[in-house]
Amino acid sequence: MSEHSLLGAGLGAIIGAILALTGAGGGILAVPLLVFGLGLSMVEAAPIGLLAVGLAASVGAVLGLRQGIVRYRAAGFVAGIGILMAPLGLWLAHRLPNLPLALLFSLVLLYACGRILRKARLELKQGQPAPRPAFMPCVLNPAQGRLRWTLPCARALTFTGMLSGLLSGLLGVGGGFVIIPALSRYTNLDSKSIVATSLAVIALVSLGSVVTASLSGIMHWAVGAPFALGAVLGLVLGRQVASHLAGPRLQQLFAITGILAALLLAGGALGLIAP
């Protein structure tokens, strides 16, 4: 294995470990790592990041399915919408210069990390997770243990799928920072089920986007394969220590790291920071 491939595998392992420790939203750092670590452009990094995040999320989703905590109908619905929207994001990405893509990614990363930071701060202050909305359009039927499918529920999940799919194709993000808050806001699922269902959506949408990128001839497998394998290995190893390290303090550290990465990415794109 070449030095470049080893570096890619090492960076992938970092992403896998972050996913294991911080949850489904941790994969958003994959693209900045590829840009900084391997010198790729945004368009080159996006499908590689999705490949790694998709495979790592697949591992988590399979484990969730075995535990019976994945709402597979909701996951399939959201993912189906996302897969349909991802090619539009990919089409837009290839028609935008690197600068606006990098700046847009930086803004999305700042937004996502800002939400994580706020949530962690509230949890530390209150000693428990922040309260959820009183009205939720998607609620479990206690008799069947399944979500009640109503028009408001379908509308909320459709919007979630559209946004996550568009961002997946456009920026190469799995969409956990969209899906997890949406499921927390619109459903009364418990946190474990929300994360597991989100991982299933991320896996399906990400891998669907990777297939689209491969068919378009823009997937660099020589870089993507070691990076993805490293991510899966990092996820498996990270899960061994996740229960001992995970918590609001770790979420704060992740959010601050993400904010710094966003600022560095924007600064590099604007020429304010030397490559």
Could you tell me what each predicted segment is?
Residues 30-44, 168-169, 178-193:
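Interfacial segments of multi-pass membrane proteins
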